[in-house]
Amino acid sequence: MLKKNKIIAVLTIEDSKKSLDLAKCLYDSGIINLDIRLRTSDSKMAIEAILKSNLNFNIGVGTVLNEKDLIYLKSMNIKHAFSPHTDRNILKQSKKYKIEFIPGISTSIDIKIAVKNGCKYLKYFHAEKLGGVTHLDSISNTIKDLKIIAMGGINNLNIRPYLNHKNI
C-alpha cells in the first residue's frame, strides 16, 4: 500500500484552490503517499484536482465514515480508505466496493475485528495520545503479518521510534 517510503502526508484541505501547490511541494519533497481527509467542503474538489495532475501520488482518503463515502471513492478509483475507528458495517461495505479499508484501532478488540474482516493494514490512531510506541508494542504482540500505520501526534521530534517499529 505504501509506496517508496513510510511517510504519509495527512491533509485536511480547507481551500481546494491551493491543493495543487501543496501537492507539488510534497511531491518535490519526495512524499508521494497522501491521506486526504473528507472533513471539509473542499475535500472532494482537492482530491479531484490532485488526481487530474500529472503527479504520481499514492492517494488514500481519510475520515471515511459511511457507504456514501465509499461510493465516492469508487467513482474516483481510489484504492484505499482510512477511518478513525473500527466499524463492522463499513468494513463489510468496503469489500463490496473493492476498496482496501484501513480502520482506526486502539485496542486488541479493534485489531481482532479488523483481522476477522480481512484487513491487512491498521491505522493506530491517535498514536501519541494512546501511549505511542509503548502502547503499540503492548497491543501488537500477536500481530505478525499485519502492517500498522501510525497517525496522530507524530512529528519530526518523535517519528524515529515509529519508523523503526517492526509492524510499521
What are these regions (language model features)?
Residues 1-79, 86, 96, 145, ...:
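Conserved N-terminal beta1-alpha1 strand-loop-helix module at the mouth
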Residues 42, 65-68, 74-161:
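Conserved anion-binding
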